[in-house]
């Protein structure tokens, strides 16, 4: 019996020793699983670098498209204003290409690129999704309404400029309500209208060009409405271009 008891005691001690050794054996395996291999880290860095390059390419492409759209729209709308004898340029400027000052389309194209990139960035920052389904058909309708508002500002005859300004303001807000309806779009549109009107006032004051029958500090009082609706339109174009692009990579 003493031999049996000593044998049983030795077996139990050996079993406990084996159980105690198992966590120590599993620890190196867990450490090996948790520690990333050099090849995995290199692959992750390459993937991050590739996504960053793709994001930059999309950013450049969107900027170019917005610049071209803004420059073309400025050229067409300015021609409409000149034909209606609303905007007056000096004789030497009228003689230039397409009867427009050479600097107007590039400036408007640059502004369109900035505004078009700013709209989706602010939407992403505020976490405010667009309320409507984004599709190019809606964007084209928005552009058509904007061109109609600009054409109406030059063609329609009202008893006074106050009625014209109120009408265009209502149309501009209707454009925002129909195609945007976001707080960020409203705020950016108002900011764009204010800043662009100040810049136009500065240019007119320095004799770069002038308006016929100015009624508010040398410029037309309805001009902020045009800038507001133009900002909303370019913002919708920028939002549409921003769909389906990869997000900007973040380095942890």
Curated annotation (Swiss-Prot):
In chain numbering, motif KxHxx lies across 246-252
State the oligomer form and interacting partners: Interacts with SCAP; interaction is direct and only takes place in the presence of sterols; it prevents interaction between SCAP and the coat protein complex II (COPII). Associates with the SCAP-SREBP complex; association is mediated via its interaction with SCAP and only takes place in the presence of sterols.
What does UniProt list as this organism's lineage? Answer: Eukaryota, Metazoa, Chordata, Craniata, Vertebrata
Q: What does this protein do, in the record's words?
A: Oxysterol-binding protein that mediates feedback control of cholesterol synthesis by controlling both endoplasmic reticulum to Golgi transport of SCAP and degradation of HMGCR. Acts as a negative regulator of cholesterol biosynthesis by mediating the retention of the SCAP-SREBP complex in the endoplasmic reticulum, thereby blocking the processing of sterol regulatory element-binding proteins (SREBPs). Binds oxysterol, including 25-hydroxycholesterol, regulating interaction with SCAP and retention of the SCAP-SREBP complex in the endoplasmic reticulum.
Q: What is this protein called?
A: Insulin-induced gene 1 protein
Q: Where is this site: Required for the recognition of 25-hydroxycholesterol?
A: 146
> Mind listing the UniProt keywords for this protein, alphabetically?
Cholesterol metabolism, Endoplasmic reticulum, Lipid metabolism, Lipid-binding, Membrane, Steroid metabolism, Sterol metabolism, Transmembrane, Transmembrane helix
Q: Where in the cell is it found?
A: Endoplasmic reticulum membrane
Which InterPro entries does the annotation name?
Answer: INSIG_fam
Record topological domains on the Cytoplasmic side: 1-59, 120-134, 180-184, 239-252
Pfam family name, one: INSIG
Q: Which residues cross the membrane?
A: 60-82, 102-119, 135-157, 161-179, 185-206, 221-238
- Extracellular compartment segments: 83-101, 158-160, 207-220
Domain note? The KxHxx motif mediates association with the coatomer complex. Binds oxysterols in a pocket within their transmembrane domains and interacts with SCAP via transmembrane domains 3 and 4.
Q: Name one GO molecular function term.
A: oxysterol binding
How does this chain sit within the bilayer? Multi-pass membrane protein
Source domain of life: Eukaryota
Name one process (GO BP) from the record: SREBP-SCAP complex retention in endoplasmic reticulum
Q: Would you identify the family this protein belongs to, as annotated?
A: Belongs to the INSIG family.
Region span, Disordered: 22-48
One GO term describing the cellular component: endoplasmic reticulum
